[in-house]
Each structure stands twice: as structure tokens, then as C-alpha cells.
Design a protein with these regions (language model features):
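Short, structured active-site "lid" loops
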Residues: 45-66
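Short amphipathic alpha-helical segments
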Residues: 17-19, 65-69
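Residues at the C-termini of beta-strands that transition into short coil/loop
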Residues: 33, 57, 84-87
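Conserved active-site segments centered on acidic
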Residues: 1-52, 102-112
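Short, solvent-exposed loop/turn segments at secondary-structure junctions
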Residues: 9-12, 59-60, 87-89
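Generic alpha-helical secondary structure signal
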Residues: 41-45, 65, 95-99
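Phosphate-binding/catalytic loops
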Residues: 68-112
Length: 112
């Protein structure tokens, strides 16, 4: 399954999500950001590639709303996007962030 992890800045959360699956034989993962200055921005090609899209936070950062508006012409976009509810409180690849990601992904049947 192709997994896309999206946060705002593409610095910590989404990159950590991608890193979790770097050695996976079951899943392929990529990451991107929605922010103006991020190095890898989410685009139509990534969205179409993904079977599931995990945004980190809707409440404070509006990531799901951004994705739904920007990519509204992509069929079944609503079904692909899942909100993990992880705030930008963790450094990249920190044990706490890894544990939080694993716990949230498990709810969607994704095991690392």
C-alpha cells in the first residue's frame, strides 16, 4: 500500500512517518508538507500515488481542509485522507513521536 504523510512544514512529523516504513516490504511511504516554505510540497502526483493520506492535525493547522480544497478534482480524495491528530510538539524521529504514530496508524490497520 502507498502511504503519504502530510504535515505543515515537512520537517518532523511527516518525515518521521515516512521513515517508519523505509524498510517495509508491505508499504511504500512518502512525505510532504502544505506550507509555503517546505522543501517537498504535496502535489497532485503524490496524492494520486497514495492509497492512504495521513494528515497530522486538522484542528490547529487545517491540513485536511487544505487537501480537500486543493485536490477537490481528484476522485475519492475524501476517502483517502485520514487525520491522525498529532500536534507539532515532537522532534523528528523522537521515540515519543514514533510511538504516537504507531498507535494512531494501528487504528487504520497499518502496522509498522
Amino acid at each position: 500500500m502507498n502511504l503519504l504523510f502530510v504535515c505543515t512544514a515537512h520537517m518532523n512529523r511527516s518525515v518521521t512517518g515516512e521513515n517508519l516504513f523505509k524498510d517495509s516490504k508491505k508499504h511504500k511511504a512518502k512525505s510532504a508538507g502544505i506550507g509555503f516554505l517546505c522543501d517537498i510540497k504535496v502535489d497532485e502526483k503524490l496524492v494520486k500515488w497514495a492509497d492512504m493520506i495521513f494528515v497530522m492535525n486538522e484542528v490547529d493547522e487545517g491540513q485536511k481542509s487544505f487537501m480537500l480544497e486543493k485536490f477537490k478534482n481528484i476522485p475519492k480524495i475524501k476517502n483517502k485522507i485520514k487525520v491522525l491528530g498529532i500536534r507539532d510538539d515532537y522532534p523528528r524521529d523522537s521515540p515519543e513521536l514514533v510511538a504516537e504514530l504507531k498507535k494512531k496508524l494501528k487504528k487504520y490497520g497499518i502496522e509498522v
